[in-house]
């Protein structure tokens, strides 16, 4: 996948991505902690990874034992699981109990590398586009209905995260809304509105996490809409995927890994 951390040897690196880095593929690159190699062509990333593995096995493996690396035809928007935190924008304050939130009052995106400073992003080069659409729709619904984002510093606020999983083959979409409390006002209306905005959504689950922690999911859950899981097919096998399930985030390369013939 493009943009990953594995592979470019330091000898081939001009400098690590910094706060001032720019990249045509992503306006947040260099600040967002999601990618660190998005400014390097995919072909060069693959070459660097191949060279790194070759260096590790030099003097150990016989000559010609290293097979060419198998990359993706399209290394973008491959992540079928997207985790988006929500946080109040700096300085955002509601004037009175009944005052409305604005979209700009709610941040969602990725954390800056090594911090818990949220970098807002409306686009992402590696996340599934339907999943990204869901996370932004939730932000807009929160603003419209004055649903407070969670504040890590104070422990106040209601919506902490959205975890979205999209079936690679099935296209089914599971949305897990992580809340800071069990009571979910107008949950049925929320589900109707989210499905109206993103019709691909097939099920919505509320996960409750009231602990002041960086751990995303809590122990309590309830299904708000649909069956509470999605089905997807991987390498000819059907999997039932819930909010807590492990499932490879790059289904394309997973199938390639398991179906490629092994040398004897």
Language-model segments: residues:
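Conserved small/polar residues in nucleotide/adenosyl-binding loops
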Residues: 258-264
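Intrinsically disordered, low-complexity regions enriched in small/polar residues
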Residues: 80, 88, 113, 152, ...
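Class I SAM-dependent transferase core
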Residues: 118, 220-257
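SAM-dependent transferase fold signal centered on methyltransferase-like domains
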Residues: 1-222
